């Protein structure tokens, strides 16, 4: 199954020329164009888990394909990108709506498994608090992030 901007289609596996090894893995797809780090409302709502057998066009960025994720871990990765913490880190390198793999360079990699030091079963606001504590953020830094990055509704 092929995901592209606002459409789903099918393509033969033999037609895939790059990163074929990602096809049969869990991964997360997030739109390449998003408003994180811009003055516009954040619209990172279209991030979703790509199950084995799925691919995407350049309309999306693939996250976690090399992490050996199962469905639960992929869902935790997807949830991570709804946190203010991760979206703030992502915003640090963005000058426009366009995102590339390089715009994720300051987003720290986490353990997305059930044995993680982060309890991914909690609501996003609680996950943010766990991340703030893990990275030793001050009250001033937390306030700055929370004033700059709106919560996902």
What name fits each language-model region?
Residues 130-142:
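Short acidic, low-complexity intrinsically disordered linear motifs used
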Residues 1-120, 124-126, 133, 147-153:
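Polybasic, glycine- and aromatic-enriched phosphate-binding surface used to engage nucleic acids
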